[in-house]
Regions:
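Juxtamembrane helix-loop-helix connectors linking adjacent transmembrane helices
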Residues: 1-25, 43-50, 119, 124-126
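Membrane-embedded glycan transfer/ligation machinery
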Residues: 2, 21, 34, 38, ...
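Short, motif-level signal for alpha-helix interfacial/capping segments enriched in acidic residues
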Residues: 2-12, 50-53, 76-91
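Residue-level signature of transmembrane alpha-helical entry/exit and packing/kink sites
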Residues: 13-18, 54-65, 80, 84
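Hydrophobic transmembrane alpha-helices of Major Facilitator Superfamily
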Residues: 14-23, 27, 31, 81-89, ...
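Active-site alpha-helix of zinc metalloproteases
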Residues: 21, 25-26, 34-35, 69, ...
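Membrane-interface helix/loop boundary segments of multi-pass membrane proteins
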Residues: 28-64, 93-98
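Functionally important transmembrane alpha-helices
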Residues: 63-74, 78-126
Length: 126
């Protein structure tokens, strides 16, 4: 799923690219999508919980944020984008129920696992 990075990784760029994918991207994506966008749509009070402990407005905010988040990942195929949408809903739930830091940590872990799988399948000759 990370084939779009083929050709970007050289011995000189490996550490910087891993840092960008595992740390920088999740940090700014969570700040934008779960901090700003999701936060802007959340109601001031969290009463009237319904599905999974979320109110209808929190669900709507999660869907909007997740759709926008998925749209910035168009480099993936449809299955990859469906997975990203699902992960985004999980990150949104984590943000609403437990705060932005947990959403960031989950995103870091996801990107680290994806990067590790990508690097393990690469030819050993960088």
């Amino acid at each position: 799923p990370m084939d779009f990075m083929n050709g970007m990784i050289t011995p000189d760029s490996l550490v910087l690219l891993v840092f960008a994918v595992v740390v920088v991207a999740p940090l700014y994506e969570e700040l934008i999508f779960r901090g700003v966008i999701l936060g802007a749509w959340l109601p001031p009070d969290r009463t009237n919980k319904k599905l999974l402990g979320l109110s209808p407005n929190e669900l709507k905010a999660s869907l909007i944020s997740s759709i926008l988040f998925t749209l910035i990942h168009l480099q993936y195929d449809m299955l990859g984008m469906a997975v990203i949408f699902g992960l985004s809903l999980i990150f949104s739930y984590a943000r609403i129920r437990h705060g932005l830091l947990l959403a960031m940590i989950l995103h870091f872990i996801n990107n680290a696992c994806a990067m590790l799988m990508y690097l393990l399948q690469m030819p050993t000759a960088l």
